[in-house]
Curated annotation (Swiss-Prot):
Protein's name in the database: Troponin C
SUPFAM superfamilies the record matches: EF-hand (SSF47473)
Source organism of this protein record: Branchiostoma lanceolatum (Common lancelet)
Residues involved in Ca(2+) 2 binding: 63, 65, 67, 69, 74
CDD domains, sorted: EFh, EFh_PI-PLC
Origin organism lineage: Eukaryota, Metazoa, Chordata, Cephalochordata, Leptocardii
Amino acid sequence: SDDYVKARVMFKEEQISEFKMAFDMFDEDGGGDISTKELGTIMKRLGMSISREELQQMIDEVDEDASGTIDFEEFLEMMARAMQDSEREIPDDELRAAFRVLDKNGDGFIDKDEFRALASECAGDDLTDDELLEFMMDYDGNRDGRFDYEEWKEIIQELKVRW
């Protein structure tokens, strides 16, 4: 379809290979399609957070034959749509609100424990302490072991650029 061609152009070959590997992991019978239930898991593994409602809406948009399964072409179209949605600018008030939610103790910083809770939610328990510390050091500009709002904002912008 035209959407598939647009998706192929939008992604680098390396990204398409990553998507294909993730897709194939869940295509257990090798039939070339996966159930819609497994899609949420794949998208999480690829670092995309998406609500159940958003996922269902995306599935409805690409599952043209209403089979309840998604083939790789439909999956790639879906990933392209998800990426385009994620490119919208996040208003500062939304970023500040998210920061306040994550700053559980209200001290104006996201410390290691608060960040660990977020990372566990996003990546499961797959993240080791070393990986967590390495990530924190990459973005902790003043090396105080925690993120202030500006550092947090930089993380969000960087993650959006990666995807």
